[in-house]
Amino acid sequence: METTTEENIRIIFGLKLKKLRTDKGLSLQQLSELSKVSVSYMNEIENGKKYPKPDKINELAKALGTTYDQLVSLKINKNLTPVVQVLNLRIINDFLFETFGVDKGLLMSMMANAPTSLSALINSVFEIARNYNLQEEHFYFSCLRSYQEMNDNYFEDIEDAVEKFKADAGINQPQQLTSEQYMQLLKQHFNYRVQESDFSDFPKLRGFRSVYVKGEQPTLLYNTRLTEQQKIFLFGKELGFATMKIEKRPITTSWLKVESFDHVMNNFKGAYFAQALHINKESLIQDLEHLFAQTTWQPNLVLALLEKYNASPEMLFQRISNLLPKFFGFNELYFIRYSSKEPSKHLKEISKELHMSRNQVDLEYIINEQNYRRWITKTMVKHLDDKFHETEGTKTFVDAVISENEEKDQYLTISMLRPMPELNNNANSVTIGFVLTEAVRRKVQFLNDPTLKFEKLGNVAELHYETPYALRKKRDEEIKMAEYDRLTKELNSSVTV
């Protein structure tokens, strides 16, 4: 999680030099006269741009009343410790400095000059992160969600890339393409080798939906147990990576290891591309208009959309979440996905979550709102679970509810529950909900349907989430990565899997 580079060493040296100089009450000009080091060069040293030669370090050490060894040592006083902790975090280097181009030396200098209260705050953040076992990937996914929320979860550049690909590939979409057709597009347009595999020779990889191996001819192995809808999404995402020329992307589905924020962002772009490619924007907008025009809640219309678009509940709801803010003005919505073997009893760690809120500055409000939305998700799944077990977990169910929280905000929430026997025998739930704003009340005609369930906020403290165990997860990643490396070597040696 931590990294010390040559650049960081320069910055640490500059911070120490500046701290020693200011502690002695010396200006740059005064230290320059004492050390015979020019003001301009010293300024570059303090800003982390230059690292002085040994003779210059000796002169600076003498002028500051310290030794050469103390000056070049990476040991620092306690006031600078939080600054260097931030500097050495790989997550900060990858995300803030590399992705967004923030000037590292300037930021560190500003932090070093800040009052000690900032150091206390940084220490507190580190302590909280340790206590709650927060990992880099949590930060990356949180930043991605914020990025989606700031853009109303609609991305014109990806929509345009989809339309261009469809035109280039000659895709006219009155009918949905099959997974076989998407596979052929990968082979014909991007020279992919696509193979089905049960990963029998690689038991640690059996839980993955797919494994990608980069090479002169890219290879995509997909699990024999995937459903048609899962293959459609998988091949569509690969088409997205290839069309948008994305290099930094995950090598497995689900994630083997989260490498960087670029990987997280690019995975989202590939997934968005797949959804937009498979579910036509204009067609779905018309279908939503028809659904909202009904004066009574019609769950069968939602299930019919799954069949029409040959899509999984998650793909359908994700695509709906792209279009509602942009084309319907439903700007306060949320999306939650989780899976569990016993959905009526507990939530496993939520695997996907998006909250678009009216109040992005009141942290307490945001936390309360997100807890409430999780609570109504669990309440919805309890309703669906009874029906689910009546069919021994073989059918997909959908239901809607109007709910109210302590602030008297009302929501319309629609949730689906479906079996997932193909990989882990879990039941998978996807939920989309939106605040009953004036825009929603004007558009959705079935809100006054007396058959719609109504729920008031219950005890959100009842929610329990399984927290990840970082060490166990890291060991598991290492084992699977070794298996992936073995598979890659065999493929590159032209051994059939």
Locate predicted features.
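Short juxta-domain linker segments that transition from a proline/glycine-rich
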Residues: 2, 11-12, 19, 29, ...
